[in-house]
């Protein structure tokens, strides 16, 4: 139960940095402005909206970190660096249990779909970057549950089944 490196954790770190910038407990950061814009409220009035939004909502603030980092914000850059390092640590831990090299790791989630984040994770792997092949799934994670249910119902799983899912599934 570790969310280090996740969109939620990066979004939560963005909000923490924004509030620390806002109230003077931390360095000034572009995240203060970007998070306030995303909230559509002044930071001083936004706490209820953040808590009501839950984890998925908080994860949407991860994209403010990318924008701030592109603008040269050191705080945002640090958040992204920490996230990439955390994900690389997860992958290193997994490599201990897999003998194949390169091991294949399927990565998914809103944040890791960004090519820049994926490249940061590869870089954070350092000398072990050739020990793991990072791939993105071509179907949503829920596809696995659908396959299980279809098999239980005696429905054959064919390439047409998969292509129909890819064509029709919308979150």
Q: Which residues are covered by each model-predicted region?
A:
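ATP-binding/phosphotransfer module of carbohydrate and carboxylate kinases, centering on a glycine-rich
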Residues: 15-171
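Hydrophobic alpha-helical segments and helix pairs
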Residues: 1-21
């Amino acid at each position: 139960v570790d969310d280090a490196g996740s969109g939620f954790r990066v979004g939560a770190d963005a909000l923490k940095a924004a509030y620390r910038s806002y109230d003077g407990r931390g360095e000034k950061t572009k995240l203060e402005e970007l998070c306030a814009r995303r909230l559509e409220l002044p930071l001083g009035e936004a706490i209820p909206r953040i808590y009501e939004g839950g984890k998925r909502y908080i994860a949407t603030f991860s994209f403010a970190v990318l924008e701030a980092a592109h603008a040269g914000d050191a705080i945002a850059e640090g958040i992204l660096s920490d996230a990439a390092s955390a994900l690389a640590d997860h992958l290193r831990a997994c490599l201990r249990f897999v003998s194949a090299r390169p091991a294949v790791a399927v990565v998914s989630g809103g944040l890791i779909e960004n090519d820049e984040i994926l490249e940061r994770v590869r870089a954070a792997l350092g000398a072990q970057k050739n020990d793991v092949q990072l791939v993105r799934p071509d179907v949503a994670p829920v596809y696995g549950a659908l396959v299980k249910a279809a098999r239980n119902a005696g429905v054959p799983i064919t390439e047409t089944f998969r292509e129909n899912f890819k064509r029709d599934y919308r979150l």
